[in-house]
């Protein structure tokens, strides 16, 4: 699972989901990529699930890059606990994704298989995504 090795502060305020991605919105490493179309918190489990979906479909011969990292903790108080008495423990780690951000990149010799693998990975993510190619970006 993707989690930070150590953090300066265990609990943070929730990040805002407004605005568009300022950087990381072009395919740079691979030939194809998954681009977010709406804001979302993507957990470390969802990232891992999408990565496994890509690897299971293409098996061998390709390369996958994960361009997001879950570096923000989300806290939650236990069920049935009254308000007050401090902030709850860290429940999960999320990546704050804004529209336009490239989430995964991939290179694979067979284009049809690569696009199908990215489509399957996109179904595991909590936001609308689209598949982009490097040659389409100028």
UniProtKB/Swiss-Prot annotation:
One of its GO terms (molecular function) is tRNA binding. The keyword Transferase does not apply. One of its GO terms (biological process) is translation. Pfam families: Ribosomal_L16. It comes from the Bacteria. Disulfide bonds: none annotated. Residues 1-16 have a biased composition (Basic residues). Residues 1-23 are annotated as: Disordered. One of its GO terms (cellular component) is cytosolic large ribosomal subunit. Keywords: Ribonucleoprotein, Ribosomal protein, RNA-binding, rRNA-binding, tRNA-binding. Binds 23S rRNA and is also seen to make contacts with the A and possibly P site tRNAs. Part of the 50S ribosomal subunit. Belongs to the universal ribosomal protein uL16 family. This is Large ribosomal subunit protein uL16. It comes from Corynebacterium efficiens (strain DSM 44549 / YS-314 / AJ 12310 / JCM 11189 / NBRC 100395). The lineage of its organism: Bacteria, Bacillati, Actinomycetota, Actinomycetes, Mycobacteriales.
């Amino acid at each position: 699972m993707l989690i930070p090795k150590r953090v300066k502060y265990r609990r943070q305020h929730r990040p805002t989901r407004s605005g568009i991605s300022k950087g990381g919105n072009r395919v740079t490493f691979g030939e194809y990529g998954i681009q977010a179309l709406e804001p979302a918190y993507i957990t470390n489990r969802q990232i891992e699930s999408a990565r496994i979906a890509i690897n299971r479909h293409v098996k061998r011969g390709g390369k996958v890059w994960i361009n997001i990292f879950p570096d923000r903790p989300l806290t939650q108080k236990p069920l049935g606990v009254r308000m007050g008495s401090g902030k709850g423990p860290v429940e999960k780690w999320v990546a704050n994704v804004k529209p336009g951000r490239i989430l995964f990149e991939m290179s694979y010799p067979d284009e049809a298989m690569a696009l199908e693998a990215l489509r399957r990975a996109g179904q595991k993510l909590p936001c609308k995504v689209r598949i982009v190619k490097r040659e389409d970006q100028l």
